[in-house]
């Protein structure tokens, strides 16, 4: 998952949206569902928030040592996933999936907010989300929403919900899991079946990666077994996807128009590859669901070190803080899920 704010000229996030306007700028009560609004096309303005990665900057090793440990901020959540840093407000959003199930045997999910150093509150109740990303203008979060088997956008100002991708050729997705957005608004997302519940399979047993461009959904790859974490390289020319049930990480060449070309293996073995982010040097940080570590790889796929969170079943990562050198880590042990952080040498991207 990765929006690249270092590219100054944006054509915006062009989405086919179905939303419901709430009062502009109004904070919604924690118990209120996000509103839905009428279909329209959203286009972000030119420009981007202050660049995370200065042009021409040189970076050394990303980790202070070959193996480092993160510090626990708080535990006791249900199951945290999908952290995304919101620079304008100075806070982190993340999905918290309940241990129980709702209708159709599907996990309910709430978006929590963490404002450093120690404040937590509910940002969107009943969000139905897993992985989160940012729109190019940073005014919306783009969410893989398993509750409606689609990809949604939530406006930060009033939490209004929109539909980014409803289906593929009239067939419902399994349960979208993770998402990334290119600086020109092209959206990529993974669709395993982890949270499909007892809803019917409309994908003929396939678990896939999809792309959304100009409101049109197209297939990237349906050969992967349970695709999970997804990210773009800093220049947007490489798409990384973790295949959870294959214990492999793949990479795809991304063309200027957002279409994908050749696929190759990036990392041949990582136990349960889950969420991922990248830093300004192009290093890749991948959460492993099997060993609870964050594995750090160079752009060439060489392992540079590991980060231990202390939590079991590490789920996802995102850079945050004023200088983007704080790596936030979510762990997903059911009913004892936690948020951790560690300071690193290289700044990175907010999801």
Summary of predicted features, one role per range:
Residues 114-118, 155-159, 212-216, 253-258, ...:
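Short loop/turn segments that connect beta-strands within beta-propeller blades
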Residues 76-90, 102-109, 124-145, 169-187, ...:
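Beta-rich, blade/repeat-based domains predominating
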Residues 247-248, 252-254, 259-263, 267-302:
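Loop/turn-rich, solvent-exposed surfaces of beta-rich toroidal or solenoidal domains
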Residues 69-74, 118-124, 162-169, 216-222, ...:
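A short beta-strand motif characteristic of beta-propeller blades
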Residues 97-99, 146, 192-194, 244, ...:
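Short loop/turn segments immediately following the C-termini of beta-strands
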Residues 34-68, 105-108, 201-203, 350-351:
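Blade/loop signatures of beta-propeller domains
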Residues 2-27:
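Secretory targeting and sorting signals
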Residues 107-112, 150-152, 207-210, 248-250, ...:
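A short loop-to-beta-strand structural motif that recurs across blades of beta-propeller domains
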